[in-house]
Amino acid sequence: MSQWFELQQLDSKFLEQVHQLYDDSFPMEIRQYLAQWLEKQDWEHAAYDVSFATIRFHDLLSQLDDQYSRFSLENNFLLQHNIRKSKRNLQDNFQEDPVQMSMIIYNCLKEERKILENAQRFNQAQEGNIQNTVMLDKQKELDSKVRNVKDQVMCIEQEIKTLEELQDEYDFKCKTSQNREGEANGVAKSDQKQEQLLLHKMFLMLDNKRKEIIHKIRELLNSIELTQNTLINDELVEWKRRQQSACIGGPPNACLDQLQTWFTIVAETLQQIRQQLKKLEELEQKFTYEPDPITKNKQVLSDRTFLLFQQLIQSSFVVERQPCMPTHPQRPLVLKTGVQFTVKSRLLVKLQESNLLTKVKCHFDKDVNEKNTVKGFRKFNILGTHTKVMNMEESTNGSLAAELRHLQLKEQKNAGNRTNEGPLIVTEELHSLSFETQLCQPGLVIDLETTSLPVVVISNVSQLPSGWASILWYNMLVTEPRNLSFFLNPPCAWWSQLSEVLSWQFSSVTKRGLNADQLSMLGEKLLGPNAGPDGLIPWTRFCKENINDKNFSFWPWIDTILELIKNDLLCLWNDGCIMGFISKERERALLKDQQPGTFLLRFSESSREGAITFTWVERSQNGGEPDFHAVEPYTKKELSAVTFPDIIRNYKVMAAENIPENPLKYLYPNIDKDHAFGKYYSRPKEAPEPMELDDPKRTGYIKTELISVSEVHPSRLQTTDNLLPMSPEEFDEMSRIVGPEFDSMMSTV
């Protein structure tokens, strides 16, 4: 999609900014007619190079002639007239000063890009604001419902007190009336009738109050059920999905504190209802009648309250931090036998009456059917302390939690050797950790159980990349915690899903994810030239099948590049110096129109162990197609000896009998090499220790420096005019410095 086309899709306020860029000196109609051609030219170079600007000026006139011819074929007289007029204006204004025209076009294109970037930021901010507003409104609505539930139960509490007072008064008046009837003098029949009418009226009030309270409790339980369903089926499910994404590098998981507040309020409300029902039962025992609404409804309401409370408590027991080895904090859910790992469970309800001696017990593969149904499925024992008392010290907010910090896995060895006949390889075999505890309260015991996300168990650290690939694939596609047979028939992933997860792998360990161009190249690697968001990638294509004609698959290649970035290229990647994922064809298209010495950095597509290279462009002396030179890729072995910025600073090419020259001048598109990498160059070291302490003229060893030198035949360098000839003595000395391999290389030229 051309830049000009993107601009035309913007809102009117941004289009107005585009209108202000163009006037009669360079009319917008030329920008419209020659949009793609204009965007492909290097106007920045032409803006300071008269010769290059002159060529581009005449090229532009030729393009207008071609456009005029197309309009002639269409018999479009008006557009023909406009083209001729525009061409004359350009000739009048810039024939003698083509650099000025190049400067105008360069600035216009540059300002267009700024407008696009501003529009994109504006749209993202708008989308973010909308999403945040929707989320905030949703939270406010739920918070209001939870608070309303709390208010309702307080109102019922007051109603029960009123009922108790009314019942006490009724009981007192009944007894008083009975005592008076039993006295010797008795009471007048008229007074007795009046008292009975009053007592009957009080009874009706008492009966109505009981019915009213029962009705309000029933309605409150209806509200609680709806609110609780939202908490359990929406909010908690969303949190668990966010946790899955966070485990595989996605945005950090949201805090559980808000959920805990809601869960706790609802739980306290249900506990209060249980107490209120007990109070109603006490009032019933003191005074009952037919039909008593308390007698009729108490068991149903009590059972319903208990079921809601049980459901809430059982759902509130979660794995707050998934199993993870401290040695690999950014790759949870992959566990190595014999290596300690940690896991943390938490109860999202703060109940003061809870038994603080509640123990959590951890099990491995409890009730896992695959142990019996999948051939070759491995079995493991948990070593270390796998039980712990839940306490509030494990959490800063007073919630009950238990973190098991010193767990290890050991494989159960069966008699004989393990066969490899099973359908799953080790890193596709999924296991799970489950946690059990009990909530004990007077007259109430609730069994709680929760399960971790599936884990992969490896026995060698070399299996970690493959195990992590399984974790990525599962958590990208599945929300079920116990689908341990997933890899018996793994589903395909949409490219739109996988591309996001791939970008997370970089953004989670660096400050920069993958941009659209980098993802486009990776998409083509997996899906071919017609890669799109709806493209389907099989599991085998992702990490089992060799890519193209290479002897390695896609994921191991990505993983080794990630390691290379983390260990040797982190600052350069964070600064955006590394283009990284770009095909050779795209690389040449970008460099073709750049000034000589322009280079870019990309990752090697042919190195399984992860490597980076640079390619630079040279102008051909005969005016033909430019020449491109790519250096042999650098792996972690070379980068452990010399940093990549120092390699770029000191890199030399050498042709026979010429002084070596550094061909790298500008980081694409036009950033001075020293400006881009200067802050990462190694600083001069202090003078080393003297060779001979008794000789004051000796200041120390002669310092050496490792540099990268490429020896090439003079015919491969198109800029040999810039290389100064060396004398035989100079050439011999340089050969000695470079190394003994130089003579053997020269003898083959």
From Swiss-Prot:
Residues recorded with modification ADP-ribosyl glutamic acid: 657, 705
Modification after translation (UniProt): Phosphorylated on tyrosine and serine residues in response to a variety of cytokines/growth hormones including IFN-alpha, IFN-gamma, PDGF and EGF. Activated KIT promotes phosphorylation on tyrosine residues and subsequent translocation to the nucleus. Upon EGF stimulation, phosphorylation on Tyr-701 (lacking in beta form) by JAK1, JAK2 or TYK2 promotes dimerization and subsequent translocation to the nucleus. Growth hormone (GH) activates STAT1 signaling only via JAK2. Tyrosine phosphorylated in response to constitutively activated FGFR1, FGFR2, FGFR3 and FGFR4. Sumoylated with SUMO1, SUMO2 and SUMO3. Sumoylation is enhanced by IFN-gamma-induced phosphorylation on Ser-727, and by interaction with PIAS proteins. Enhances the transactivation activity.
Sites of the Glycyl lysine isopeptide (Lys-Gly) (interchain with G-Cter in SUMO2) crosslink: 703
InterPro entries: p53-like_TF_DNA-bd_sf (IPR008967), SH2 (IPR000980), SH2_dom_sf (IPR036860), STAT (IPR001217), STAT1_C_sf (IPR038295), STAT1_SH2 (IPR035859), STAT1_TAZ2-bd_C (IPR022752), STAT_linker (IPR048988)
Conditions for induction: By IFN and EGF.
PTM-bearing positions, type Phosphotyrosine: 701
Location of N-acetylserine modifications: 2
UniProt cross-references to Gene3D superfamilies, sorted A to Z: EF-hand, SH2 domain, signal transducer and activator of transcription 1, STAT transcription factor, all-alpha domain, STAT transcription factor, DNA-binding domain, STAT transcription factor, N-terminal domain
Sequence similarity: Belongs to the transcription factor STAT family.
Subunit architecture: Homodimerizes upon IFN-gamma induced phosphorylation. Heterodimer with STAT2 upon IFN-alpha/beta induced phosphorylation. The heterodimer STAT1:STAT2 forms the interferon-stimulated gene factor 3 complex (ISGF3) with IRF9. Interacts (phosphorylated at Ser-727) with PIAS1; the interaction results in release of STAT1 from its target gene. Interacts with IFNAR1. Interacts with IFNAR2. Found in a complex with NMI and CREBBP/CBP. Interacts with NMI which is required for CREBBP/CBP recruitment to the complex. Interacts with PTK2/FAK1. Interacts with SRC. Interacts with ERBB4 (phosphorylated).
Name the record gives this protein: Signal transducer and activator of transcription 1
Lineage: Eukaryota, Metazoa, Chordata, Craniata, Vertebrata
